[in-house]
Amino acid sequence: MFEKGSTAVLSTSRLPFIVAVKNAGLYSFEKGEWLLQYPLSHSIYKLVGISPYIFGIGDNGLIVRYNPYNNKWTHTFFPTPQRLWDITGNESGIIITHVGSKLYISYNFGSNWSVIHPFKELSIKPFIRSLFLYKEHLYIGTQINRESGGLWSFSLESGELTLVKKESNSMISSIYIDCEDCMFIAKGNARSKEGSIEMKSLRGSRWRTFEQTISEKAFLDVFNVGKNLYTTTSKDEYGYSRIYEINKQRHILLPIETIEGHGFRGAGCKDELFISSPIESKWIDRSYEMTKLVH
């Protein structure tokens, strides 16, 4: 049933992993045991826990929500044929996702939505690829756009748009900010093979690129497990991608595992990691250095 792999994964306090199995729905996964939570024929590309809710987004404007108060999953669609890549929010009820170059924002955990055009003053508007809400600032990573591509900061209070990092030839596929106010971005360009992980302090302006021993076309996801950070990549010419541990102190990427296909998303729970690829899913138990394919 799982030979097609998965496209997104989330670790929660209630379940070690919730997995979006490609074109099949949402499953819980615990120690090798699968249980269907919500059947769905559309693929989901990001799952996020925004306490106390869970949200997912995917193909054709899909948005999924789990409501813990009635223990139910529901889904609907934004009016677009586009794939949604990212969703972010906070515990006060702000939820933000994207369609093309515009934002959909809710102030009540997805019950009602309105549209914001952060790039309305730009003559060439980039498509959005990644989002991260930090306090009142929304950080926006774009798809490749020579004129307007890069990392942007949008103030939810004033509506001011600020270019944080210009990128003419790379997409920014993932953004993460840790508890020490350090920002990490995952970059990629399949044509030029110029993927990288970069970091800077929110209080500074200098970007540092992490050293890597293997050239990667693109890094796709950055996720944390406790105090540890990890990243996934696109597949190489042999059809395999890698999972790296991000060593913040030494500014290096440490390869720890491979997976067939693009490593779309990753998540972790204690010593366990789960990596989602559309070809296969991989469960890694680092306490015993044990790896299992769970496709």
PLM features per residue range, with description:
Residues E3-R14, H42-I50, P81-E91, I124-F132, ...:
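Repeated scaffold domains used in trafficking and secretory/extracellular systems
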Residues N23, N60, G100, I144-N145, ...:
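Residue-level signature of beta-propeller blades and closely related beta-rich strand-turn architectures
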Residues F109, W113-D178, F184-E194:
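Solenoidal tandem-repeat scaffolds enriched in leucines and small polar residues
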Residues L15-V19, Y53-G56, G93-I96, H137-I140, ...:
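Entry beta-strands of beta-propeller and related beta-repeat scaffolds
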Residues M1, E33-Y38, K72-F77, W113-E121, ...:
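A short beta-strand motif characteristic of beta-propeller blades
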Residues S28-F29, R65-N67, S106-Y107, S153-F154, ...:
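Conserved Ser/Thr-centered positions that define the repeating blades of beta-propeller domains
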Residues G261-H295:
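Blade-level signature of beta-propeller repeat domains, shared across WD40, Kelch, NHL, RCC1
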Residues M1-Y38:
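An edge-strand/N-cap motif at the start of beta-rich repeat modules
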